[in-house]
């Protein structure tokens, strides 16, 4: 993950944290309900969209998640949403459009559409408002980031300091 991230402008710590959240670093992980597979749990349609032919191939999965993250970052930035690890992970999980809709709903206090509501409910947010779900997601991401930092340190891996996190 660290090696593949060197040629991109994506923070390796973010990529490590995402792999920890999505699959606990298991490249053979599979969600039997959604069909999501691999290190970053790409669903088949997203895998195809980002050229991921074999989601169980870690190198391919890392290259695809870098492309996906860059696309998500561009959409978040264009929408005026801060581009950081927690928001990029929210965009990975909800789709960039879903993340933007969540932020807009949180700002306006408006209800969410059925698809986003269903996604929130399926991801531990049953009964939460958009704002509450975003805050829960940020806390979850930061908790996993801290755990990932500990794992990396325990493995004796030194990461370069990265701004914007």
Feature roles, as predicted:
Residues 3-6, 105-165:
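Extracytoplasmic and endomembrane cell-envelope/extracellular-matrix remodeling and assembly machinery
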Residues 1-127:
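Catalytic glycan-binding domains that act on GlcNAc-containing polysaccharides
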């Amino acid at each position: 993950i660290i090696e593949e991230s060197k040629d991109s402008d994506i923070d390796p710590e973010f990529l490590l944290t995402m792999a920890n959240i999505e699959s606990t670093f298991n490249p053979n992980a599979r969600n039997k309900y959604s069909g999501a597979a691999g290190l970053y749990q790409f669903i088949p349609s997203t895998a195809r969209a980002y050229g991921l032919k074999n989601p169980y191939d870690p190198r391919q999965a890392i290259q695809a998640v870098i492309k996906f993250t860059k696309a998500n970052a561009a959409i978040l930035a264009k929408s005026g949403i801060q581009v950081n690890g927690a928001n990029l992970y929210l965009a990975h999980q909800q789709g960039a459009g879903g993340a933007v809709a969540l932020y807009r709903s949180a700002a306006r206090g408006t209800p969410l559409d059925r698809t986003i509501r269903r996604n929130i409910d399926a991801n531990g947010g049953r009964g939460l408002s958009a704002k509450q779900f975003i805050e829960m997601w940020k806390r979850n991401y930061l908790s996993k980031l801290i755990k990932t930092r500990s794992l990396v340190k325990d493995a004796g891996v030194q990461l370069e300091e990265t701004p914007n996190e």
